[in-house]
């Protein structure tokens, strides 16, 4: 029964269209969000992700389409009656009120009996580990603590959905990492659907059950963090999520159902793909820096692999990143290897000749024209 409830749609966005003056921001946008899900909407500035959030919240009016919340059409219902709360980037705390009164504000607006307010506020503050700071003012709290107050205020009236609009972007790196873990743990504890908007790819991968990647008002890919990172469906998603190397390839022939022989940057390679291909067809081969294997070569040594020379290296603690210029076309390739101080060949010298291969089957293969 619990799985059925969890898999039940809590929000359905049906053919949403939103324009400002003559500019269309969202066009025929469709999305189903399940109960208890941590969904992140990810995309560059101006892609329409915040507009989607504001439409769900009821802060913007649709031009076309319907918004369904827990089976009820709320398209024409005002924001304050939607059982949806929002945590903004600015937190929007009242500076003249105590933390307790900030969290209690929404309950008082809803005319909740005074006898019920204190236990509910203290329960919310306990969830975010701030019950001992109930009498302080927001200015007496750190940025991370203010963030937690904003979350407590948002969840105290038990909304069906919590919206978070770039709500970690104002924090420093260390605190942001801590809050990512806390938010995910809190979401599991509450069982509330979280919809999180960000342009930070690492944040999305860390926190989400599911990611929507947007560009120009449309969904480019909808999938788990692992799917989005390891199996991007087009070049936009591949380039937007993390570092990636994109190689040009020309099909020679298909050798079996899952393997194609192709010329990749001047070298004949076997690539794994089930795409329907023809001889001389152009493809793109996508490899993450950690997918690539480096083998050092003597300067006069030959290899059937892709050849290049190390032009830069960067030690990053757990990993060593090497920048390599290919001999074939001067393309720059980024390679990331786990650092092993006992391996004499891991710390490649600038100028070192190298052969590049990759872990079999780790490549992503796309049609050459598949960029959006």
From Swiss-Prot:
UniProt xrefs under Pfam families: ABC_tran, TOBE_2
Protein localization: Cell inner membrane
Swiss-Prot/TrEMBL keywords: ATP-binding, Cell inner membrane, Cell membrane, Membrane, Nucleotide-binding, Translocase, Transport
EC number: 7.6.2.11
Principal location listed in the UniProt entry: membrane
Binding positions (ATP): 43-50
Catalytic reaction list: ATP + H2O + polyamine-[polyamine-binding protein]Side 1 = ADP + phosphate + polyamineSide 2 + [polyamine-binding protein]Side 1
Top-level taxonomic group: Bacteria
UniProt topology in membrane: Peripheral membrane protein
ABC transporter domain ranges (all copies): 11-241
UniProt-listed SUPFAM superfamilies: MOP-like, P-loop containing nucleoside triphosphate hydrolases
Gene Ontology terms: cellular component: ATP-binding cassette (ABC) transporter complex
CDD domains referenced in this protein's UniProt entry, alphabetically: ABC_PotA_N
Self-association state and partner proteins as the record states: The complex is composed of two ATP-binding proteins (PotA), two transmembrane proteins (PotB and PotC) and a solute-binding protein (PotD).
Biological function: Part of the ABC transporter complex PotABCD involved in spermidine/putrescine import. Responsible for energy coupling to the transport system.
Entries under NCBIfam families matching the protein: potA, PRK09452.1
Protein family according to the UniProt entry: Belongs to the ABC transporter superfamily. Spermidine/putrescine importer (TC 3.A.1.11.1) family.
Stated name of the protein: Spermidine/putrescine import ATP-binding protein PotA
Gene that this polypeptide is encoded by: potA
